[in-house]
Amino acid sequence: MNLSDHILTESELAVLSKGLNFIPCFNTKDYTSALTQDLKLFHRRLLLNKYFEDEGDGNRELFVYPNREWTPNHNILDSSINKGFKQCYEHLRHHQTFSCYHNITIEERQALKSLRSNRDIVINVADKGSNVVIQNTSDYKTEIYRQLHCSHHYLRITEPIYPTTAIKLTKILSRLKRSGFITPKQCTYLTPPPDPRPRRIYTLPKIHKPPNEWFFPSKIPPGRPIVSDIDSESYHIAEYINHFLQPLASRQASHIKDSFHFLTLLKDCHYVPSHTLLITLDVDSMYTNIDNTQGLRCLRRIFDTHPDPARPDDLLLDLISVSLSGNDFLFDGVYWLQNSGTAMGKIFAPAYANLFMTVIEQDFFLTRSFIPFFYKRYLDDIFMLWNHGLPCLEEFIAAFNGFCPSIKFKQLIDPVSVDFLDVTVFKHSPLAPQTLLCTKVHFKVTNTLQLLHRHSFHPKHTFAGIVRSQIYRYYRLSSNIEDFHSTTSILFKALRRQHYSARFLLLIKERFMRDIASGTLIGSRPKPHVTAQILPLVTTFHLGSNSVVSCFIRELRQLDSPDLAGTRIVTAYRRNK
């Protein structure tokens, strides 16, 4: 979607239509050097796995820096393994390199460089769906400034406060170490770095919102604000906080993990009365609207409800308080401070918001005579089933909207069907006294089903895996086989435009249907207990090195070595840049 004043050339349009996850051909003659280094790292991983085999993953200390320099003596490994590595190194020294085919034209490659260097436009992925959105840089900044000028949420500051925040966090970490809650190594890992990276704000355009409701109708869409916390003074501390908050959030009665978890929970309401109303609620700007004073009180209640002697409640709340109050960031050369709620981008933000909403829900329900007989929430999206009539429901929602001053809801009520997450929940027989609740895949209007272009520079098995996983997802989300076939047809039409052949797609679906019929589909039956430890050889994908890696892994698997017993060696490819 081009919202900018820049007129895209044919080549620019062609390269953008491939999607932002498209990888141009990685064409270098030095891939053997990189592969040799990756093999050495994998060799070291095998040595470390052997050296620490008696300790197990359960005893591994969390929140510590790994020692990247020390390597155990090679003699602890079976000689046949070391010999295999030596032969592979020697083979790579004499390996004949070759160039890969080009998956974009010369004009498209030039267009890509031109788009990268164009400072007048910003290219982003849409907030929902897979659309590529091009905006004028000035329009993009206008939307961010519109949000920043809300004094309730943000405050302009003359200088960064993260150096002061780092000092406060370091003092709390020292108390944690003295109290025995963290080790000296963990304290080193969690301590803010001497030169932390300033946080930066960016937005993802919400083009799924009605264009007439945009800040500048049909021109500047609202943006979802995200503050990048990576390498900041509190980044590792956020990991530590999330270690305690996330398990608590997952234990709450209203919690939904994902769409599949939602379907499992919905099975408890298999049949509902015909007068049942289906409702979805959306919390408006939940992250930024949390009152942090109230949020910390909510966390204290959760901690008291779920006591854990290994959890440093008081000091943990101190860490959270300092992290929330010190959330400054840089935008366009100016520092700003978020003074309300938390920001998407902070690791513990989803768990914090979840627990805050849990307490709000619990307290509100205690004040009501009538409540939903089914109530579940995924972050800021709520699904309810209601049997007490529309007037009572409207009173319930109005009271919910006024219960917590900072939290407001947008509702959708329907007697037959509603869309929630990526599913549509509907009544099978709306006029029957008791009706079955069914589900099918929901496609948002802006979802272009841009998965991965078939010509992207990825391993071949990646494309089949993506298609099969989507077919499997559609199958699980569809109550009726007719809906499943209908949604896969929509998917296949979109994939054909991304240069997937019809034969390739049909073969994958036919194989999937055979697995369904025979009961051999993975995921359709309980998973067996797997004890094998996965050891990945991580490397950068290149056609020239792929055969070498495959051959080496195959030979390792065939070795009858006790050092490889109970392990499963796989190849993992890092993203090309």
PLM features: what roles do these ranges have?
Residues M1-K577:
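Charged structural interfaces that engage phosphate-rich ligands
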